[in-house]
Amino acid sequence: EEQLEQVKAVAPNYLVKTSTDHLSSAEEEAIEIMLGWHKEIGPRLLASDTSHLKWIQLISAGADYMDFDKLREKGILLSNGSGIHSVSISEHVLGVLLAHTRGLQESIQQQMQHTWNQTAPSYQQLSGQKMLIVGTGQIGQQLAKFAKGLNLQVYGVNTSGHVTEGFIECYS
């Protein structure tokens, strides 16, 4: 709701509707900017000869489901959310890695069972270890940056094997 009000404030000359609003055929045809992809309205607008659609801003990084030829033919701008989740995904990956190498799952289970088995968890030191990241795009680069902070030696895999910033070496 707050974001919707912010959009309305910066675009007072536009009518802002959400996917939960009922749109008449005329309102649908008048859409100029679409935030996110509506699986029913979007294809109708692309197929229409009278649609005013000019820009689609996806909220995801992936756009492989879009009809690029139709977008190009109609002159519709397409942008995506590439990289917007790179920090949160990288933090999650490192959190899971740390939980695994420090035996946190076993420790939590023992705590819930009110037991303490000093020999059960096997702790592994991450510092100095090698990490291979499949994909050297924005998420992979952010993960590499965080991993270097833990003194990991970071290698990558990408489509061409080109060296990417933050990686010691990359493979294809």
Regions found by a protein language model. Give the residues of each.
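Phosphate-binding beta-alpha-beta segment of Rossmann-like dinucleotide-binding domains, i.e.
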Residues: 76, 81-130, 156-159
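Short, charged, surface-exposed secondary-structure boundary motifs
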Residues: 26-28, 65-69, 88-92, 165-168
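Generic structural signal for small/hydrophobic residues in well-ordered secondary structure
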Residues: 34, 56, 71, 93, ...
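Rossmann-like dinucleotide/phosphate-binding beta-alpha-beta segment
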Residues: 121-172
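An N-terminal-biased, well-structured beta-alpha scaffold segment characteristic
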Residues: 1-77
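Short gly/ser/thr-rich secondary-structure transition/capping motifs
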Residues: 13-20, 36-39, 110-119, 166-172
